[in-house]
């Protein structure tokens, strides 16, 4: 699995929506998401429309319009998001559980490469299925509290 720019932007946009999530119908304006995460607005609109069609976000039209998570952040996993934006989590399609395609090896059941790729897939899936947007928000808050190290400074 390689996270594309589109996938990264989707996660960053959803992080904003998760941090601002409330049980009421309040929304976050797309311009605000764009500015807070430095994402081009046109590209962000496409990503959010895609996430809307997946049922991850919902929108409200009009002057007071914007986007919000459709479910609480505790109920949206990184796997939900990445599978929709990027496709399979598996590094090769012959080990994908949701997007399986036969590979060209003579015997899949005895392929050493496939065996390692399956272990890789299992590790990725275990993490992505466990981490929710709520946990991502918690991590972001903790990281924001940490002092910058000398290697974080750029001259």
Which residues are covered by each model-predicted region?
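A short alpha-helical element within helix-turn-helix/winged-helix DNA-binding domains
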Residues: 28-38
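Short amphipathic alpha-helical elements of helix-turn-helix/winged-helix folds
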Residues: 13-20, 84
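Conserved segment of winged-helix/HTH DNA-binding domains
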Residues: 73-98, 113-122
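C-terminal regulatory/oligomerization modules of transcriptional regulators
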Residues: 96-155
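Short alpha-helical segments that sit at the start of domains
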Residues: 1-14
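Beta-hairpin "wing" of winged helix-turn-helix
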Residues: 55-70
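Basic amphipathic alpha-helical segments that dock to polyanions
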Residues: 17, 47-52
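Key DNA-contact positions within bacterial/archaeal DNA-binding proteins
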Residues: 42
């Amino acid at each position: 699995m390689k996270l594309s720019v589109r996938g990264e932007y989707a996660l960053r946009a959803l992080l904003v929506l998760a941090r601002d999530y409330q049980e009421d119908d309040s929304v976050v304006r797309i311009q605000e998401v764009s500015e807070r995460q430095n994402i081009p607005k046109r590209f962000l609109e496409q990503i959010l429309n895609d996430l809307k069609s997946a049922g991850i976000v919902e929108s409200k039209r009009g002057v007071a319009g914007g986007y919000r998570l459709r479910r609480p952040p505790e109920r949206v996993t990184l796997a939900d998001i990445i599978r929709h934006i990027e496709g399979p989590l598996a590094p090769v399609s012959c080990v994908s559980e949701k997007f399986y395609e036969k590979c060209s090896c003579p015997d899949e059941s005895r392929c050493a490469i496939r065996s390692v790729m399956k272990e890789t897939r299992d590790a990725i899936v275990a993490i992505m299925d466990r981490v929710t947007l709520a946990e991502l928000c918690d991590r972001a808050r903790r990281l924001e509290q940490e002092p910058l190290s000398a290697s974080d400074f750029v001259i």
